C-alpha cells in the first residue's frame, strides 16, 4: 500500500483526492497538510506527496523537501520563474512530476495539438480556455502549456508571438501569432480548445472536464508511478509513456 500525503488538503483538489483514495486498493491518504501543519510529521507519514496548494505553498514544500527528499507530484499552477527554477534544482535529489493539468485526456490533447501544429504550418492557431468564476490565474496553466507546445512545434518563441486579447483597430493578424483567450463563469471545471484555421477549412481539438475527480485520479496515477522512479523532473507524458 502506497502512503500518499496531500499538500493543500483542505482545497478543492485536496478534498477530491482524499475522496478518490477512499476506494483505492493500491494507495491511501496517510497525511494531510494545510496552514498550520508541521512538515516533519507530514513527511514522516507518507511515501509520496501530491501538491495542490498555492505558488507560495509549493515553494515552501520544495524548500523543505530539498533537505528531506520525497517524491513530489506537483499540480499547483501560477508558479513564477524563481519557483520553477527551485523545482528544477530540487529534482536533482528527488523525483518530481510537474503537470499543469493532471487529466489523461489533456495529455492526449497536448500530443495531438503538437502534431497538428507541426503538420499544419499555414494554419492560424487560437487557444480558448474556460474555467469557473473563482479561478485566480489567467490564462490557465494548461492553456499556457498548450500554447508553449504548439509554439515549440513551429520553433517559435511564445513570448514574442502570444496575444492575450484584441480590441479596437489592431490591423491584420500576423502569420505566427498564437492567441490565448480566457473565459470565466459559473462552475466550469475546465475546458480547453486548440483551433487551427485556414482558408476553406479548420480543425478544433477540444477537451472538457466535468468533474474534479478527473484531475484527482490522474494525480493519483502519477503518484503511484513516481514513487518508483529515479531522481529527475518528469511530466504526465512520462507517466503515460507517450
UniProtKB/Swiss-Prot annotation:
Which enzyme class, named as a word? oxidoreductase
Q: Which pathway is this protein assigned to?
A: Amino-acid biosynthesis; L-lysine biosynthesis via DAP pathway; (S)-tetrahydrodipicolinate from L-aspartate: step 4/4
Q: Which family does it belong to?
A: Belongs to the DapB family.
GO annotation terms (biological process): diaminopimelate biosynthetic process; lysine biosynthetic process via diaminopimelate
User: Keywords for this entry?
Assistant: Amino-acid biosynthesis, Cytoplasm, Diaminopimelate biosynthesis, Lysine biosynthesis, NAD, NADP, Oxidoreductase
Listed under catalytic activity are: (S)-2,3,4,5-tetrahydrodipicolinate + NAD(+) + H2O = (2S,4S)-4-hydroxy-2,3,4,5-tetrahydrodipicolinate + NADH + H(+); (S)-2,3,4,5-tetrahydrodipicolinate + NADP(+) + H2O = (2S,4S)-4-hydroxy-2,3,4,5-tetrahydrodipicolinate + NADPH + H(+)
Checking HAMAP family in the record gives: DapB
Report which gene this protein is encoded by: dapB
What highest taxon heads this organism's lineage?
Bacteria
Residue positions of the active site: 131 (proton donor/acceptor), 135 (proton donor)
> Has keyword Oxidoreductase?
yes
The entry marks the following residues as binding NAD(+), namely: 8-13, 75-77, 99-102
Tell me the GO molecular function terms. 4-hydroxy-tetrahydrodipicolinate reductase; NAD binding; NADP binding; oxidoreductase activity, acting on CH or CH2 groups, NAD or NADP as acceptor
Q: Where in the cell is it found?
A: Cytoplasm
- Annotated EC: 1.17.1.8
- Which Gene Ontology CC terms are recorded? cytosol
* One Pfam family matching this protein: DapB_N
Protein name as annotated: 4-hydroxy-tetrahydrodipicolinate reductase
NCBIfam families for the chain: dapB
Q: Which residues bind (S)-2,3,4,5-tetrahydrodipicolinate?
A: 132, 141-142
Protein's job: Catalyzes the conversion of 4-hydroxy-tetrahydrodipicolinate (HTPA) to tetrahydrodipicolinate.
